[in-house]
Amino acid sequence: MLTRQARLLRRIPPPNAVLQSGLQRRHRSTDRYSNNIHTSSTQNAPAPVYDTPIREKGMTLEAKERVRAHVRKIQSSASTAAASPAVRPQPAQHFQAAPQPMPTNMPRFESDSQVKNGLDYSFIGLSGGQIFQEMMLRHDVKQVFGYPGGAILPVFDAIYNSPHFEFVLPRHEQGAGHMAEGYARVSGKPGVVLVTSGPGATNVITPMQDALSDGVPMVVFCGQVATNLIGSDAFQEADVVGISRSCTKWNVMVKDIAELPRRINEAFKIATTGRPGPVLVDLPKDVTAAILRTPIPAKSVQPGHSPYLPSNPLNPSSQPSDPLPGDADLITEAAQMINKAKRPIIFAGNGVLSSPEGPKLLKELSDKGRIPVTTTLQGLGAFDERDEKSLHMIGMHGSAYANFAMQEADVLIALGVRFDDRVTGKVDTFAPAAKAAAAEGRGGIIHFEIQPKNINKIVEAQIPVLGDVVASLGELVPQIEAVDRSAWIGRCKATKERYPFTYTPSQEGQKLKPQEVVQELDRQAEALGKEKFVISTGVGQHQMWACQYYRWTEPRSWVSSGGLGTMGFGLPSAIGAKVAAPEKYVIDIDGDASFSMTAMELATASQYDIGVKVLLFNNEFQGMVEQWQDLFYENRYSHTRMTNPDFVKLSESMGAKGLRCTKLEDLPRMMKEFLEYDGKRPIVLECLVSSEHVYPMIPAGKALHEQLLHPLLRNGSE
């Protein structure tokens, strides 16, 4: 009598039977699929080649002999096959050539026959990866930053050795995201990122949040596990759509190959519409590996032209079409308030830089109305700081004279700003003179802004003008009257002379002062031409000194992390900026702590001959944190001191040239060597600097006029 276990074993077929049964089912399934294709393509379809019936206990003798003959044919031809190359060819690199904009972004149809009855047939027979490549071409994408992985390989295979793209492979996906940001900030075009699923996608979360905070257009494409595996905790599966929901303007998972072109178009349009920002498109592997078999709506393959698309500064002829206009009556009301003002001030932000016309209109407004100008950190370069009406940057570490002027102005003209806490200080005490003038009906706050949620979110505006800032400026400037405001300009000038940016110069035998290094860079950049320079920074004290002691004169010459304050931003963003503008000097002013977070991207610059220059401040401290510990935590330096590597040797090990400056008398010569070094190779100039505080400084919870001044100025403060 059989045991229960024996009876169960008898029910399990032998392994070869299971394999044979599976092959038979697969063969029958393939036959049905092949028959369906032939039937749909023609009425007189020939019979499938493999039409010999499969019997339950094996193939017929005729079928077996046909298989053996096929194997013999393969074996006989194997000896004559060409050997595969030992090293796959690399795409040509053209980073040192100035980018040439395409004449049009419209799709390039081979013939009218590809569109019939509103349906497009041009993508039939292409894989999802090939469709991705074609859509990038239609969106004039020339540079892609990313890192491959299993889930995104169908796309990487489609763009392999493509002559249409310059692909930059970073050492970390976060580097790819910041490179795309730097590229977008300098070029005005959205940066494109291509990464795999799981950690590849989550490593781009920080750059996406950074781009969202600062209004940078970026399109991130990430791989995903196959749709039938979603939710199964598959290898490198992550709910990146859920994770990125709060740090993108829009995100989507493409679930069918037929919707891929439409989703790509939507991504580019949303990233560049209104206030620019990041978007994410999740691409399951079975979608990018699939073949499109049916026509799709013709409109879905045509790049959408956003009416508010920022212009490309590298192509001045590219202008936004039909920008969102501001309310004409409100603009007229704003002009009337400005014309009556005795002490107006212009507060310019990143929104002014959305078009090449923005800085021009800002200058015209300031010159015509004799109005002083201050900027946000991200507005640097919108107004020439050599102009006598420039008050430089405002805020926590802005100029003392800009902060004082903001508190005294009776009309505040805010252009494309968010009024974040680093600018306003204590909100209740921000711009008191303008608020008092508003209560008396003779002044107030005018806010030009494209994003509705920023209107009256922090600071109440008496005249809120919702719309494209540059378009609104174009309507405002003709209505501004020439008014004599010499008394107000004179007061601002006197305050500027009384409270300048100040530091104690280094003495012989002492370490360099970081301010001295920035001033020397500014002096030599002025001699070479400021229009030839782009400056990026990390985050920390060095970032603030760059704002204070470098005179900003050119739009889109400043690349820095403002809203999120991302350490490690400087070097990868400089690489992206250099890719966008290879003809310019691109300099990353960085601190030792910030640089160390993404220092390996120096190897990326070496690999691709991207000639970025790193001006590195080494004080072996996390400087800004140490400053707060000094001022507010009784000098308790909790985990802010660092032991650094030899940055010169580290740079040389990654193919870059390394220099080190320790003396003030050597600084001009070494700065000159630094700037004149080969524009195709990266270089690092390490400057050993003393530990300093950044002044002025507005302590948390204090008003703009309650700023901490440099000790040399405090006796004369008001």
UniProtKB/Swiss-Prot annotation:
This is Acetolactate synthase, mitochondrial. Pathway: Amino-acid biosynthesis; L-isoleucine biosynthesis; L-isoleucine from 2-oxobutanoate: step 1/4; Amino-acid biosynthesis; L-valine biosynthesis; L-valine from pyruvate: step 1/4. FAD binds at residues 275, 397-418, 449-468. The lineage of its organism: Eukaryota, Fungi, Dikarya, Basidiomycota, Agaricomycotina. Residues 1-53, 75-99, 301-326 are annotated as: Disordered. It is an enzyme of class 2 (transferase). Its cofactor is Mg(2+); thiamine diphosphate. One of its GO terms (biological process) is L-valine biosynthetic process.
